[in-house]
Design a protein with these regions (language model features):
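Alpha/beta-hydrolase superfamily serine-hydrolase fold, recognizing
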Residues: 1-194
Length: 194
């Protein structure tokens, strides 16, 4: 592949550097940066946040991180698992990580529940619903956060045919979407107060 997951991480950190360098011009507080992502963006955000606190992981990805720390994450319907024996994992890994990723230094990090990755994360608010086709990804990832005593919260909506994958992004005017955005904002405010 011409453009891999590692390139996406590099782009993310270039954007974060821009925010760090120029955010003050727009009255932003560059020491109070929070991140929200959905689906594949939630996965990218998770990995980039972990790389900020795990130099071994960043080196394995050959990524130069931006030191502006992400204070907390909002992860909506995260596509955390990319190498499972399912629709995502059957074809995606070689395109994301390269054809030889299993022999690379990054190989252990492909598992998002790898202890060194999980313990490098800032506080996380996870959002899913019973009708999210990746519901099991979020709940399994939440178990890893619990196992390693990482600060987090799970917002898991009940069965409702309107609350499909990343519903708060695709259907922003649903009451549950408003509730999701409000919950993320309140969680970030709590983290800021600590």
């Amino acid at each position: 592949p011409e453009y891999t997951f590692y390139h996406q991480c590099t782009d993310f950190f270039q954007a974060l550097r821009y925010v760090q360098d120029y955010g003050n011009l727009y009255y932003g507080k560059t020491d109070e940066i929070y991140g929200v992502g959905d689906s594949g963006g939630a996965m990218l955000l998770t990995y980039c946040a972990a790389m900020q606190n795990n130099t071994e992981m960043a080196a394995a990805a050959q990524v130069s991180v931006c030191p502006a720390p992400l204070q907390a994450l909002g992860l909506i319907s995260g596509m955390f698992y990319t190498n499972r024996f399912d629709q995502i994992g059957l074809s995606l890994p070689k395109y994301l990580y390269g054809t030889d990723y299993k022999q690379s230094d990054f190989a252990p990090y492909v598992n998002p529940t790898y202890q060194k990755l999980v313990q490098a994360l800032p506080p996380c608010l996870l959002v899913t619903s019973k009708n999210d086709n990746l519901h099991h990804y979020t709940t399994k990832f939440e178990k890893a956060l619990t196992k390693y005593n990482m600060p987090h919260r799970l917002l898991d909506f009940p069965k409702n045919k309107q609350l499909t994958h990343a519903f708060s992004v695709f259907e922003p005017f649903l009451p549950e979407s408003t509730q999701t955005i409000q919950a993320i904002a309140e969680y970030f405010a709590e983290i800021h107060e600590q």
